[in-house]
Design a protein with these regions (language model features):
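A short tyrosine-centered beta-strand micro-motif
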Residues: 117-124
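Short consensus segments that form the blades of beta-propeller domains
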Residues: 90, 131-135
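Primarily secretory-pathway and cell-envelope proteins
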Residues: 26-88, 144-227
């Protein structure tokens, strides 16, 4: 039936194919370099550390989704972690790595609601315990914290970071945003790519960790199957 349809009505078949392609494309996430000013609600101490170049992420239909500012020269760990499931072991737990502004209400990697607004991002690792088993194959995360209560650029101990991050959700759990390996990054950065197996979108961009440029992959849409 489909073969007869395409044989006798090639123009209609082509139009349908283009329609499906356009529909799929309209659901894409896209990333581009921008120069949106760092939000004023971030403290001057942290604002001074952030790059003036940002990454703009557009959601389905091209609507504004979020803006990301990474820290210029993120301090590298003196002894990088090589623990199982850690892909970004040169990052230091509790360190300020950047800031993010969401234009719309979003869901984090645990499917928790996060309101539109500006947040700091600190690096953390998923604890190895029964409460987090099966959440992700990868232990690297950015945790959101409220900028009006997180004004110092000092490293935070895990518990202090978790306490602050809990204030960005209504569930009593920190807001976690998964970092994935950069091997699926598009050729041109910044860029976004979909993981169809796990049904999430990640944005990939360069960040300077110590003296080395590092490609990071941050999941910005989609959540763990086992939150």
């Amino acid at each position: 039936m489909i073969r007869r349809f395409t044989h006798f009505f090639p123009a209609v078949a082509l139009a349908l194919a283009l329609s499906f392609a356009t529909s799929a494309s309209a659901q894409d996430y896209k990333a581009a370099t921008s120069a949106v000013p760092v939000p004023p609600e971030i403290s001057s101490a942290i604002r001074a550390l952030l790059s003036p170049a940002s990454t703009s992420v557009a959601g389905p239909g091209g609507s504004p989704y979020c803006e990301i500012w990474m820290r210029t020269g993120i301090p590298a760990a003196a002894q990088p972690s090589s623990a199982l499931g850690v892909n970004y072991g040169t990052l230091v737990e509790g360190e300020v790595v950047g800031a993010i502004h969401f234009d719309v209400a979003v869901k984090d990697f645990r499917n928790q609601s996060v309101k539109p607004g500006t947040y700091l991002m600190r690096y953390g690792q998923q604890p190895v315990d029964g409460n987090h088993q099966g959440v992700s194959d990868y232990r690297d995360f950015f945790l959101l914290t409220p900028p009006d209560q997180d004004a110092s650029a000092d490293i935070l101990a895990d518990n202090a970071m978790y306490v602050l991050s809990r204030k960005t959700t209504t569930t009593g759990h920190p807001s976690v945003w998964s970092l994935v390996p950069a091997d699926s990054a598009p050729a041109s950065l910044p860029g976004a790519a979909q993981n169809t197996d796990e049904n999430f979108w990640a944005v990939y961009f360069k960040a300077a960790v110590g003296s080395s440029p590092t490609t990071l992959g941050l999941v910005i849409f989609g959540h763990a199957a086992t939150p």
